[in-house]
Amino acid sequence: MGDAADPREMRRTFIVPAIKPFDHYDFSRAKIACNLAWLVAKAFGTENVPEELGDPFYTDQYDQEHIKPPVVNLLLSAELYCRAGSLILKSDAAKPLLGHDAVIQALAQKGLYVTDQEKLVTERDLHKKPIQMSAHLAMIDTLMMAYTVEMISIEKVIACAQQYSAFFQATDLPYDIEDAVMYWMNKVNEHLKDIMEQEQKSKEHHPAEAPGGQKARYRKEQTLLKQLPCIPLVENLLKDGTDGCALAALIHFYCPAVVRLEDICLKETMSLADSLYNLQLIQEFCQEYLNHCCHFSLEDMLYAASSIKSNYLVFMAELFWWFEVVKPSFVQPRVVRPQGAEPAKDVPSVPVLNAAKRNIRDSSSSSDFSSRYTRPQTHSSASGGIRRSSSMSYVDGFIGTWPKEKRTSVHGVSFDISFDKEDSAQSSTPNRGIIRSVSNEGLTLNNSRASKHIRKNLSFKPVNGEEEESIEEELHVDPHGDLQSPMPLNTNELNSNESTHYKLPNGALQNRVLLDEFGNQIETPSIEEALQIIHDTERPPHTPRPDQIANGFFLHGQDLSILNSNIKLNQSSPDNLTDTKGALSPITDTTEVDTGIHVPSEDIPETMDEDSSLRDYTVSLDSDMDDASKLLQDYDLRASNPREALSPCPSTISTKSQPGSSASSSSGVKMTSFAEQKFRKLNHTDGKSSGSSSQKTTPEGSELNIPHVVSWAQIPEEAGVAPGRDTTQLLASEMVHLRMRLEEKRRAIEAQKKKMEAAFTKQRQKMGRTAFLTVVKKKGEGISPLREEAAGAEDEKVYTDRAKERESQKMDGQRSKSLADIKESMETPPGRWLKSPTTPVDPERQWNLTSPSEETLNEGEILEYTKSIEKLNSSLHFLQQEMQRLSLQQEMLMQMREQQAWVISPPQPSPQKQIRDFKPRQAGLSSAAAPFSSDSPRPTHPSPQSSTRKSASFSVKNQRTPRPNELKITPLNRTLTPPRSVDSLPRLRRFSPSQVPIQTRSFVCFGDDGEPQKEPKQKEEIKKEPSECKGTLGPCDHNPGEKEIKPVESTVSEVLSQPITETVCVTPNEDQLSQPTEPPPKPVFPPTAPKNVNLIEVSLSDLKPPEKADVSVEKLDGESDKEQFDDDQKVCCGFFFKDDQKAENDMAMKRAALLEKRLRREKETQLRKQQLEAEMEHKKEETRRKTEEERQKKEDERARREFIRQEYMRRKQLKLMEDMDTVIKPRPQAAKQKKQRPKSIHRDHIESPKTPIKGPPVSSLSLASLNTGDSESVHSGKRTPRSESVEGFLSPSRCGSRNGEKDWENASTTSSVASGTEYTGPKLYKEPSAKSNKHIIQNALAHCCLAGKVNEGQKKKILEEMEKSDANNFLILFRDSGCQFRSLYTYCPETEEINKLTGIGPKSITKKMIEGLYKYNSDRKQFSHIPAKTLSASVDAITIHSHLWQTKRPVTPKKLLPTKA
């Protein structure tokens, strides 16, 4: 079968069409041809394709194919892309696409990113000249994917399959477009088989109809056997479609009148001709009836290269669109002819997963099927599929439902964002799937939808980590739900009542049928109703379990977030809902997927409110991910109680409803908590390399914190009619920069948060100052209502300010969420910022993501704020009581130590005291109050619980001595406020004892600036500090570096906390008080330089027992008491003034302790230093040792290699010697041979005349012919194969020669195989002993030594002698290096004997006589000198020392000649 003309031009023939053989089939050309044919057809319309674009290739004069310049120009100019893209991606008809970038952006808005080999294709790539075809192919593939997802969706496929299949199993559900296509084909073909079965049975009873099948080509083989036609199952879309059986059967089912079953070749084993027949049938059908939608050649469909998978998918999607959406007149699905019944249709169409699920759960499931699903079946068959909004989220399907095999990707890249929220685990599990509405249009390439490749890296872990249960849970109907009441959970019902088809932008029609669990069409609730449902039903599920709270971080309480979400949902208009229907594209985890984040540009303000953007793409993630589960859940859960639908998995929100839920509109619902944003960013950055947004594959959206019910607020009816609002097209281009912008927004939000908290702190401090001033004014009067009022007023101010800021921030979409978080956290003390794991917050706060509106929070905030104010007032009440006690103490102390003031020298005070002083100052004093780090969610101090509550107070004039740690200490004033932390601020303080277990007391530090009386008190305070430091050690150590607060004006400190009732406050007994002299047992803290501020610090616990207020002496002795307290409880601390002596003693002890501690620290430091040095030295030594080992290893390796080489050389030499059996014999042999030398010499000279007589011509000839060869070979030792084996024996210049360097090499390598001794590569030596060099010698004599007619006689004679000899090895004796022939010897390698056979020379030759060895090169007909000293069987000629020839050379040669002859 030779090459055919363009296969597209071939007409179907009943002879096998000519096709290109597989080895001649160019896959890359085929891909280009298919892509360009499709693109041109979509750009110009199949009827209007210009002639020059019909075949994109031309052949040059060298028979090389190239793309035609017009096609290249159209590609480079983007005209084709703009034309096709405008048809396929027309979300905005008013704004035509112009340029490559516009098309890329439009695709990105669809969630499809153009990637070539995992790199994003840019406009520059598409403009490159010469054309970069791979980028253009990627672009076309992405357009094809966009078109594919417009034509076909998993939901439509399932709805279609429900018409033809009575029962579905959960495992049958398709999970991406490719799988959906195969699912559709298989279901339809199964139904066709059922029809044929019934027809065959009927034929048995109605034989008249039997002839109808006579023409079928399969009938001869199968029908006669009464077998059904073999319609293969499609398991691999490409490979199983190569024979055309399944596809032709599918076409027959839909168009039985056009493509008759009898015309299809259906066999068990299909031949090539059969396959071509079917494929040709398919092509002709598509060309004639389906507007040339098949852009393949026969070879393309037959060989089914993986590169054309996207082409095949778009072809199948178009078939589906024609058959199930457009349904032209010729599309009339086949029914059972004899009875006119449709067995499959009679069977109720069961929602795919519901059937399987109900089999498990409902005993009466079978009875329910018919009642529940008959209507949906009928409706879906009429409409051709569950209606999806025109935007048809690309691959929105059952991506997250369950993991299936991952497939290779199209041209997209994406990555997965998976959030795991503990709080959603409990309540959302049963409801997980509820929100996946059938109308999940906004979804972009879902994992399920994305071609199988797209799902490559998807993580299918459910949000709450319950991976195993994901499928069942999604389908689970809450047992409390009313299964009988079809809930109007889905606005899809808007479309369910419409059987009309809405034209997609690309002409695809979409039908959306919304059915309840019983198959009844659902009346979707209004948005307000849906929101109300959400509001009412969602709270219970959101209540987190305690363990969930502990395990997760919840920035916001759920109640508020739910309230917000409800409000925002109410605020969002149906228009927004409509706009957002396409809003969010799930992000696939695959690195190869074209999916991206779909964020509706309409819905998201230009500012890209962080929350909304985050939420948008996260929500879309979830909603998209689970289209399949969504479909099933819609069936399943519609009947269930609305509460089920409210599972906190916002991910289930369909993208359509997302605008409502996520408030993607400019108002921007803040759906994301900071922690969640960070978490997302972490996940997001993990996938950054993928080049596209990631998609959540888990069915739950709980991590999104969006109420499920929002999904019910599906797009209103107009949504179906507005194809232009394709969700996937919204803001995709901006999403490309989302990651960077999210980071910026996060920073802005954090800054705003700090700002808000700083303002709040300032207000709180003002309030505290007012309260303290009031307390000072009315020391002896009980609680001052003014103070409470002031506190309340301050709180109100703070609240009002915060509210105003909140309003302003609301205007700024990005900050609104952060403000909501801040406000909630600041205003609701119990559920404060929980950055620390120990302080869990209401999960609902974590759900702040869903909080749509913050204005509605005001009431709740007011309540909580009021509570905090009340708590503050109670704290102030304690302070008032304490003030009274302190006034009594002050009077006593003033009497005792009126003028005494001592300053603690800088080294004396313990650093912890310093720290404590500073902490209180910073936390309590307004000057220090600025934005607390503690205000931020993270408590600055690790152990805020242990911090005792103290307030900074007034300072005196005493000097501060700067400390090396930059803490300035005012000697006389010691403030022991606890380190600032979440618990230190009432607004952030958690009052649950578990959270602040150690906080047992509140301290009020205050004093008059100028009172010298307070200095003694301060002294006692300082004394008591060490004891208190024990109690507050953790906190004390934490802020050594905090700023000192100016003592003079810091008159007020915040009420840091109330005493925690949980902790036991043991007040010092009088016995304890009587031990004032007892040294502070805990000079653990290095003393800090005393402060100038005069503070009297009294534990509130002391205030509580009334008796202590009366005992002033108790206060004098209080320090030791306090120390005892600290020893026992470490919770109640107070500062009291003592005698100077006691203070001095205490100071001395403190100094000693400090010195001891310093020494200890120095020792520890030195020890640590030594250890570090030792470690460093050890590391260096290790490194040195390793380096030495490496070097030694290298040297050893080198030496080993050298040794191996030397050993190899030695063995080679030994081998050579062994071959010749001359392993260096002892010298005695040589001596023995010496005795024979005279004879040989004598004989040599006697015989030598022979040559002059008979062979002068011979020698001259041999000189002439051999000299060149020998001279060339003299230096052959230079570098030859054999020279390697005998390198030690090279004789570089035996005699000057012309070309001799290479002779040896050539001789040895090209000599005849018979010698077997030449070097032939890695083998340096070949055993020749068993062979004979007889023929080599004969060749040498005939062609070299005795060549020519002149030497004919001598040559014949010598050859005859050789024939007579039994020897295997012969040697030629040369006169010298000139290679003149003298005689022929026999050589026995075993005995190493060399005996003369004929010619002139010694009778025998010994080793010592040999001077040179020669090897004959049969090709060059020359002898080459062998650079060796050892004789072996590979030697063909030798020379002997010249002195052996010269003896009596002229003596009577003629006499000897006759005798010799």
UniProtKB/Swiss-Prot annotation:
<feature type="region of interest" description="Disordered">
    <location>
        <begin position="361"/>
        <end position="389"/>
    </location>
</feature>
<comment type="similarity">
    <text>Belongs to the CAMSAP1 family.</text>
</comment>
<feature type="modified residue" description="Phosphoserine">
    <location>
        <position position="654"/>
    </location>
</feature>
<feature type="compositionally biased region" description="Low complexity">
    <location>
        <begin position="654"/>
        <end position="673"/>
    </location>
</feature>
<feature type="modified residue" description="Phosphoserine">
    <location>
        <position position="1293"/>
    </location>
</feature>
<dbReference type="InterPro" id="IPR001715">
    <property type="entry name" value="CH_dom"/>
</dbReference>
<dbReference type="GO" id="GO:0050773">
    <property type="term" value="P:regulation of dendrite development"/>
</dbReference>
<dbReference type="InterPro" id="IPR022613">
    <property type="entry name" value="CAMSAP-like_CH_dom"/>
</dbReference>
<feature type="modified residue" description="Phosphoserine">
    <location>
        <position position="905"/>
    </location>
</feature>
<feature type="compositionally biased region" description="Basic and acidic residues">
    <location>
        <begin position="1011"/>
        <end position="1028"/>
    </location>
</feature>
<feature type="compositionally biased region" description="Basic and acidic residues">
    <location>
        <begin position="677"/>
        <end position="687"/>
    </location>
</feature>
<dbReference type="GO" id="GO:0030507">
    <property type="term" value="F:spectrin binding"/>
</dbReference>
<dbReference type="InterPro" id="IPR014797">
    <property type="entry name" value="CKK_domain"/>
</dbReference>
<keyword id="KW-0597">Phosphoprotein</keyword>
<feature type="modified residue" description="Phosphoserine">
    <location>
        <position position="992"/>
    </location>
</feature>
<dbReference type="GO" id="GO:0015630">
    <property type="term" value="C:microtubule cytoskeleton"/>
</dbReference>
<feature type="modified residue" description="Phosphoserine">
    <location>
        <position position="1285"/>
    </location>
</feature>
<feature type="region of interest" description="Disordered">
    <location>
        <begin position="1004"/>
        <end position="1044"/>
    </location>
</feature>
<feature type="modified residue" description="Phosphothreonine">
    <location>
        <position position="975"/>
    </location>
</feature>
<keyword id="KW-0175">Coiled coil</keyword>
<feature type="region of interest" description="Disordered">
    <location>
        <begin position="787"/>
        <end position="855"/>
    </location>
</feature>
<feature type="compositionally biased region" description="Basic and acidic residues">
    <location>
        <begin position="1104"/>
        <end position="1124"/>
    </location>
</feature>
<dbReference type="GO" id="GO:0031113">
    <property type="term" value="P:regulation of microtubule polymerization"/>
</dbReference>
<feature type="region of interest" description="Disordered">
    <location>
        <begin position="639"/>
        <end position="704"/>
    </location>
</feature>
<feature type="modified residue" description="Phosphoserine">
    <location>
        <position position="439"/>
    </location>
</feature>
<feature type="modified residue" description="Phosphoserine">
    <location>
        <position position="836"/>
    </location>
</feature>
<protein>
    <recommendedName>
        <fullName>Calmodulin-regulated spectrin-associated protein 2</fullName>
    </recommendedName>
</protein>
<keyword id="KW-0966">Cell projection</keyword>
<dbReference type="InterPro" id="IPR038209">
    <property type="entry name" value="CKK_dom_sf"/>
</dbReference>
<feature type="modified residue" description="Phosphoserine">
    <location>
        <position position="647"/>
    </location>
</feature>
<comment type="subunit">
    <text>Interacts with CAMSAP3. Interacts with KATNA1 and KATNB1; leading to regulate the length of CAMSAP2-decorated microtubule stretches. Interacts with a complex formed by AKAP9 and PDE4DIP isoform 2/MMG8/SMYLE, which recruits CAMSAP2 to the Golgi. Interacts with MAPRE1/EB1.</text>
</comment>
<feature type="modified residue" description="Phosphoserine">
    <location>
        <position position="1291"/>
    </location>
</feature>
<feature type="modified residue" description="Phosphoserine">
    <location>
        <position position="573"/>
    </location>
</feature>
<feature type="region of interest" description="Disordered">
    <location>
        <begin position="1069"/>
        <end position="1090"/>
    </location>
</feature>
<keyword id="KW-0333">Golgi apparatus</keyword>
<feature type="domain" description="CKK">
    <location>
        <begin position="1321"/>
        <end position="1455"/>
    </location>
</feature>
<dbReference type="GO" id="GO:0051011">
    <property type="term" value="F:microtubule minus-end binding"/>
</dbReference>
<dbReference type="GO" id="GO:0000226">
    <property type="term" value="P:microtubule cytoskeleton organization"/>
</dbReference>
<dbReference type="Pfam" id="PF08683">
    <property type="entry name" value="CAMSAP_CKK"/>
</dbReference>
<feature type="region of interest" description="Disordered">
    <location>
        <begin position="1163"/>
        <end position="1321"/>
    </location>
</feature>
<dbReference type="InterPro" id="IPR031372">
    <property type="entry name" value="CAMSAP_CC1"/>
</dbReference>
<feature type="domain" description="Calponin-homology (CH)">
    <location>
        <begin position="211"/>
        <end position="324"/>
    </location>
</feature>
